[in-house]
Amino acid sequence: TDMPIQVILRKHEGGFVSDRCLRASDLNENLGEKNNPEWKTIVYDNKSKSFVAPNGSIGFRWGEEGKWNLLHQSGGQEIDQELSCLGNQDELVSVGFPHFTPNESDLLWRNVPVRKVKNAKNEEMYVTSVFDLQVANYGIDRGLGGENVAQSYSDSSVAYTPAWAEKITGVKAADIERTGREFADNA
C-alpha cells in the first residue's frame, strides 16, 4: 500500500499543500541508497525511529536483484511502517485540499500531523503520510480541530458529509449513509 509513504508539504497561502513523495535523493547522502535514490520513496520505521527506503519502490526494480518485492524490509532489516504520525507528530499544520464545488472555496483547509526532517541541503521540510493526508481530505475528525471538520453526518456546512451531498445531488442523506454502510459491510 502507498498509505505509509511520506509526502513533502510545501507552503501555500499561509498553510501547506501536498507536493510529492519524499525520496531517498531528498535526504542526506541519499539515505545510503546508491542505486536509483531518486526513485525510492520513503516511509517512517517505528522500529528504528527513522526514515527508511522500504523494498518495493520502483527504484529497486533495476540493479538490485531480489529487492523489488513487498517484504517489510529496508537494508535487509525488518521494518514496521508507520501509517500515521498522529500522537508522535512534531507539529500540526493546516493543509489545503482541492475542492471543486462551484461558489465554494477552491481549497478546504484541514489540520494534519507532520514530522520535520532535514533535506540534503540541511533545509527543514514538513512531511506526512499518504494516510494522514487521505483521512484529512475525507474530513474525518481525529481530534485535531480546525476548519472544515464535520461534527456529524448531518452537518451540511462541511463538504463531503451526507447532508452536504444531499444539497448538491438531491439524494437523501439517510440513503447516502445507508449505502456507505452497505459498501463497508461488503468490503
Model-derived features with residue positions:
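Long, well-ordered, tryptophan-enriched scaffold segments
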Residues: 1-186
